[in-house]
Regions:
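N-terminal secretory signal peptides
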Residues: 1-9, 24-25
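Extracytoplasmic entry segments of secretory-pathway proteins
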Residues: 3-6, 16, 20, 40, ...
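N-terminal beta1-alpha1-beta2 submodule of the flavodoxin-like/Rossmannoid cofactor-binding fold
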Residues: 33-143, 155, 225-231
Length: 232
Protein backbone atom coordinates (compact mmCIF):
# COMPACT_ATOMS: atom_id res chain seq x y z
CA UNK A 1 0.00 0.00 0.00
CA UNK A 2 2.79 2.44 0.95
CA UNK A 3 4.65 1.52 -2.23
CA UNK A 4 1.56 2.34 -4.37
CA UNK A 5 1.10 5.67 -2.54
CA UNK A 6 4.76 6.54 -3.04
CA UNK A 7 4.57 5.66 -6.76
CA UNK A 8 1.41 7.72 -7.25
CA UNK A 9 2.96 10.71 -5.46
CA UNK A 10 6.06 10.43 -7.60
CA UNK A 11 3.97 10.37 -10.78
CA UNK A 12 2.09 13.49 -9.63
CA UNK A 13 5.42 15.24 -8.95
CA UNK A 14 6.72 14.36 -12.42
CA UNK A 15 3.45 15.50 -14.02
CA UNK A 16 3.57 18.84 -12.16
CA UNK A 17 7.20 19.34 -13.25
CA UNK A 18 6.30 18.61 -16.87
CA UNK A 19 3.37 21.02 -16.78
CA UNK A 20 5.49 23.75 -15.21
CA UNK A 21 8.15 23.23 -17.87
CA UNK A 22 5.53 23.55 -20.62
CA UNK A 23 4.07 26.70 -19.09
CA UNK A 24 7.52 28.24 -18.74
CA UNK A 25 8.29 27.49 -22.39
CA UNK A 26 5.04 29.12 -23.50
CA UNK A 27 5.51 32.24 -21.39
CA UNK A 28 9.22 32.88 -22.03
CA UNK A 29 9.67 35.70 -24.56
CA UNK A 30 10.85 34.46 -27.94
CA UNK A 31 14.13 36.16 -28.84
CA UNK A 32 13.81 37.56 -32.36
CA UNK A 33 15.86 39.92 -34.45
CA UNK A 34 13.42 42.78 -33.83
CA UNK A 35 14.26 43.91 -30.29
CA UNK A 36 13.49 47.45 -29.20
CA UNK A 37 16.24 50.04 -28.95
CA UNK A 38 16.08 50.33 -25.16
CA UNK A 39 16.19 46.60 -24.41
CA UNK A 40 19.97 46.51 -24.98
CA UNK A 41 19.81 42.82 -25.84
CA UNK A 42 22.97 40.91 -26.74
CA UNK A 43 22.49 39.63 -30.31
CA UNK A 44 21.90 35.90 -30.47
CA UNK A 45 24.09 33.80 -32.75
CA UNK A 46 22.33 31.82 -35.47
CA UNK A 47 23.59 28.37 -36.40
CA UNK A 48 24.30 27.70 -40.05
CA UNK A 49 23.35 24.20 -41.13
CA UNK A 50 24.95 22.76 -44.24
CA UNK A 51 25.70 19.47 -45.92
CA UNK A 52 29.05 19.35 -44.11
CA UNK A 53 28.21 21.60 -41.15
CA UNK A 54 30.18 21.40 -37.94
CA UNK A 55 33.59 22.35 -39.28
CA UNK A 56 35.97 24.37 -37.14
CA UNK A 57 38.34 27.12 -38.21
CA UNK A 58 41.84 26.23 -39.29
CA UNK A 59 44.92 27.75 -40.87
CA UNK A 60 45.22 31.11 -42.61
CA UNK A 61 42.01 33.17 -42.69
CA UNK A 62 40.45 35.46 -45.31
CA UNK A 63 37.60 37.77 -44.32
CA UNK A 64 35.60 38.81 -47.41
CA UNK A 65 32.59 41.07 -47.04
CA UNK A 66 30.12 43.30 -48.86
CA UNK A 67 28.69 46.31 -47.05
CA UNK A 68 26.62 49.31 -48.06
CA UNK A 69 26.73 52.73 -46.33
CA UNK A 70 24.15 55.46 -46.89
CA UNK A 71 20.49 55.51 -45.95
CA UNK A 72 19.56 52.41 -44.01
CA UNK A 73 16.73 50.79 -42.05
CA UNK A 74 16.59 51.68 -38.36
CA UNK A 75 13.78 50.26 -36.18
CA UNK A 76 11.16 50.94 -38.86
CA UNK A 77 12.58 54.36 -39.69
CA UNK A 78 15.60 55.46 -41.73
CA UNK A 79 19.07 56.58 -40.70
CA UNK A 80 22.25 57.56 -42.53
CA UNK A 81 25.31 55.37 -42.07
CA UNK A 82 28.79 56.63 -42.85
CA UNK A 83 29.97 53.03 -42.48
CA UNK A 84 27.69 50.13 -43.39
CA UNK A 85 26.57 47.74 -40.67
CA UNK A 86 28.37 44.75 -42.16
CA UNK A 87 31.62 46.72 -42.37
CA UNK A 88 31.24 47.64 -38.69
CA UNK A 89 30.90 43.94 -37.88
CA UNK A 90 33.83 43.04 -40.14
CA UNK A 91 36.04 45.58 -38.36
CA UNK A 92 35.11 44.13 -34.99
CA UNK A 93 36.01 40.64 -36.18
CA UNK A 94 39.28 41.87 -37.69
CA UNK A 95 40.22 43.48 -34.37
CA UNK A 96 39.91 40.10 -32.65
CA UNK A 97 41.54 37.65 -35.06
CA UNK A 98 44.48 37.44 -37.42
CA UNK A 99 43.07 37.57 -40.96
CA UNK A 100 43.42 39.18 -44.36
CA UNK A 101 40.49 41.36 -45.46
CA UNK A 102 38.91 41.70 -48.91
CA UNK A 103 36.05 44.14 -49.46
CA UNK A 104 33.62 43.16 -52.22
CA UNK A 105 32.69 46.28 -54.20
CA UNK A 106 30.23 46.44 -57.11
CA UNK A 107 31.12 48.00 -60.46
CA UNK A 108 27.65 49.57 -60.45
CA UNK A 109 27.34 51.09 -56.97
CA UNK A 110 24.08 50.61 -55.11
CA UNK A 111 21.89 53.72 -54.59
CA UNK A 112 22.27 55.89 -51.49
CA UNK A 113 18.49 55.58 -51.02
CA UNK A 114 17.45 52.61 -48.90
CA UNK A 115 14.16 52.05 -50.76
CA UNK A 116 15.88 52.23 -54.15
CA UNK A 117 18.45 49.69 -52.95
CA UNK A 118 15.69 47.35 -51.75
CA UNK A 119 14.01 47.52 -55.17
CA UNK A 120 17.26 46.86 -57.00
CA UNK A 121 18.03 43.94 -54.70
CA UNK A 122 14.63 42.37 -55.41
CA UNK A 123 15.11 42.82 -59.17
CA UNK A 124 18.53 41.17 -59.02
CA UNK A 125 17.17 38.25 -57.03
CA UNK A 126 14.26 37.76 -59.42
CA UNK A 127 16.61 37.85 -62.41
CA UNK A 128 19.17 35.61 -60.68
CA UNK A 129 21.66 38.35 -61.57
CA UNK A 130 25.40 38.32 -61.03
CA UNK A 131 26.42 41.96 -60.38
CA UNK A 132 29.99 42.61 -61.49
CA UNK A 133 32.70 43.05 -58.86
CA UNK A 134 35.16 45.93 -59.10
CA UNK A 135 38.81 44.91 -59.30
CA UNK A 136 40.40 41.50 -59.15
CA UNK A 137 39.29 38.67 -56.90
CA UNK A 138 41.50 37.23 -54.17
CA UNK A 139 43.33 33.96 -54.61
CA UNK A 140 42.14 31.38 -52.10
CA UNK A 141 45.29 29.29 -52.38
CA UNK A 142 46.94 29.32 -48.99
CA UNK A 143 43.73 30.12 -47.11
CA UNK A 144 41.98 27.38 -45.18
CA UNK A 145 39.15 29.42 -43.65
CA UNK A 146 37.00 32.08 -45.36
CA UNK A 147 34.64 34.37 -43.45
CA UNK A 148 31.84 35.63 -45.74
CA UNK A 149 30.03 38.76 -44.54
CA UNK A 150 27.02 40.56 -45.99
CA UNK A 151 23.75 42.24 -45.17
CA UNK A 152 20.54 40.27 -45.65
CA UNK A 153 17.81 41.71 -47.86
CA UNK A 154 14.60 39.98 -48.86
CA UNK A 155 15.76 36.96 -46.80
CA UNK A 156 19.03 36.38 -48.63
CA UNK A 157 22.48 37.85 -49.18
CA UNK A 158 22.83 40.29 -52.10
CA UNK A 159 23.44 38.58 -55.43
CA UNK A 160 26.94 40.05 -55.61
CA UNK A 161 27.88 37.50 -52.94
CA UNK A 162 26.97 34.74 -55.41
CA UNK A 163 29.09 36.49 -58.05
CA UNK A 164 31.97 36.24 -55.59
CA UNK A 165 31.49 32.67 -54.38
CA UNK A 166 30.83 31.16 -57.82
CA UNK A 167 34.14 32.44 -59.20
CA UNK A 168 36.35 30.93 -56.51
CA UNK A 169 37.27 27.38 -55.54
CA UNK A 170 36.10 26.67 -51.99
CA UNK A 171 36.86 22.94 -52.03
CA UNK A 172 38.10 21.86 -48.60
CA UNK A 173 37.89 25.43 -47.27
CA UNK A 174 36.03 26.16 -44.04
CA UNK A 175 33.34 28.76 -44.80
CA UNK A 176 31.98 30.90 -41.96
CA UNK A 177 29.05 33.23 -42.76
CA UNK A 178 28.24 36.38 -40.82
CA UNK A 179 25.40 38.78 -41.55
CA UNK A 180 23.69 41.97 -40.46
CA UNK A 181 19.95 42.14 -40.90
CA UNK A 182 16.65 43.78 -40.01
CA UNK A 183 14.69 40.64 -39.20
CA UNK A 184 15.91 37.68 -41.28
CA UNK A 185 18.97 36.46 -39.38
CA UNK A 186 21.30 34.48 -41.63
CA UNK A 187 18.53 34.23 -44.21
CA UNK A 188 19.16 31.58 -46.86
CA UNK A 189 22.95 31.80 -46.66
CA UNK A 190 23.25 28.14 -45.61
CA UNK A 191 21.47 26.95 -48.76
CA UNK A 192 23.00 29.54 -51.08
CA UNK A 193 26.59 29.02 -49.97
CA UNK A 194 26.15 25.26 -50.01
CA UNK A 195 25.19 25.63 -53.69
CA UNK A 196 27.95 28.05 -54.69
CA UNK A 197 30.82 27.03 -52.38
CA UNK A 198 31.04 23.46 -53.61
CA UNK A 199 33.14 21.16 -51.49
CA UNK A 200 33.36 23.60 -48.58
CA UNK A 201 33.05 22.76 -44.90
CA UNK A 202 30.61 25.02 -43.04
CA UNK A 203 31.14 26.36 -39.54
CA UNK A 204 28.57 28.09 -37.34
CA UNK A 205 27.62 31.55 -38.58
CA UNK A 206 26.57 34.67 -36.71
CA UNK A 207 23.70 37.04 -37.50
CA UNK A 208 23.48 40.43 -35.79
CA UNK A 209 20.61 42.87 -36.10
CA UNK A 210 21.88 45.94 -37.92
CA UNK A 211 20.71 48.38 -35.26
CA UNK A 212 22.56 46.36 -32.60
CA UNK A 213 25.89 45.85 -34.34
CA UNK A 214 27.64 48.67 -32.49
CA UNK A 215 27.26 46.83 -29.19
CA UNK A 216 27.72 43.28 -30.46
CA UNK A 217 31.32 42.91 -29.26
CA UNK A 218 30.53 40.31 -26.60
CA UNK A 219 28.44 38.18 -28.97
CA UNK A 220 31.10 38.37 -31.68
CA UNK A 221 33.89 37.39 -29.29
CA UNK A 222 31.86 34.48 -27.87
CA UNK A 223 31.03 33.23 -31.37
CA UNK A 224 34.63 33.41 -32.60
CA UNK A 225 35.81 31.59 -29.49
CA UNK A 226 33.11 28.94 -29.86
CA UNK A 227 34.11 28.03 -33.41
CA UNK A 228 37.80 27.89 -32.60
CA UNK A 229 39.42 31.20 -33.52
CA UNK A 230 42.49 32.28 -31.59
CA UNK A 231 41.88 35.80 -30.29
CA UNK A 232 44.36 38.53 -31.12
Amino acid sequence: MHQRDHTAARRRTILRAALLTGVTAMTMPHVTSCSSADEQQTPEPSRTPGPTAGGGVRGKVLLAYFSRPGENYYYGERTHLEVGNTEVMARKIRALIDCDVYRIEPVDAYPASYDATVKRNVREQQADARPAIKGGLPELDGYETVLLGSPIGNVRAPMIMTTFTEQLDFANKTVVPFTTHAMSGLGTTARDYADSCRGAIFAQGLAVQGEEVGKADRAIRAWLNRIGFAMA
